[in-house]
Amino acid sequence: MRKMKMNKFNIDNLNLFYGENQALKQICLPIPNRQVTALIGPSGCGKSTLLRCLNRMNDLIEGVKIDGLLSMDGEDVYGNIDVAQLRIKVGMVFQKPNPFPMSIYENVAYGLRAQGIKDKKVLDGVVEQSLRGAALWDEVKDRLKSHAFSLSGGQQQRLCIARTIAMEPEVILMDEPTSALDPIATKKIEDLMESLKKDFTIVIVTHSMQQARRISDRTAFFLMGELVEHDDTHALFSNPRDDRTRGYVNGDFG
């Protein structure tokens, strides 16, 4: 039986420095399994930095120093682990759609081919399953050989989600995945997240408080590198404990 209330990640006294600049300050945050957790706050508050800690994307930035504990299923993410495998388990969808310059089919199959999977029946099955999972199959099933760039922006973003799903991750990180999309495409992505959380843990960075309220189960509010407050989303927006949270969700600053 699936244990919905277990935490996928536990973050304890996490600090991150870019050189001498401290971007995250003693962050303590549980991220529950198979729920949507939204990270909100004004620009530069540290929410995207924390998101990138979860799959060690910050390792790619020169001069980054991290201390504290970040565990996934009880295993130290910054311990002696295979980072490539971590990034398969913890997939990422970026702010702007970034399909590869190849066909729709090959975008989804790319990661599988990179792992040495060549069986066409296996590839066909995973491509269809992943596109269905991203609510895109019915729109593209008759043109899988078409170039990915022929898709609309919203379709391209769902293709990127399908590409992530194909690798069978446990977690999907989303860094403002709808900020470049129109309202109709945004609604499709939001509806998709509701269905995806049945199988995946989702952590999303969003500048839209309305979006956080619509889609997330838990919300964490960041300000100047600090985690000010985290709670059930309804509770955080309707009855915040901290005056800074109240000011932000009321639109007093942002």
From Swiss-Prot:
Its EC number is 7.3.2.1. One of its GO terms (molecular function) is ATPase-coupled phosphate ion transmembrane transporter activity. The keyword ATP-binding applies. SUPFAM superfamilies: P-loop containing nucleoside triphosphate hydrolases. It catalyses: phosphate(out) + ATP + H2O = ADP + 2 phosphate(in) + H(+). It holds the Pfam family ABC_tran. Its main location: membrane. It is a peripheral membrane protein. This is Phosphate import ATP-binding protein PstB 2. The gene is pstB2.
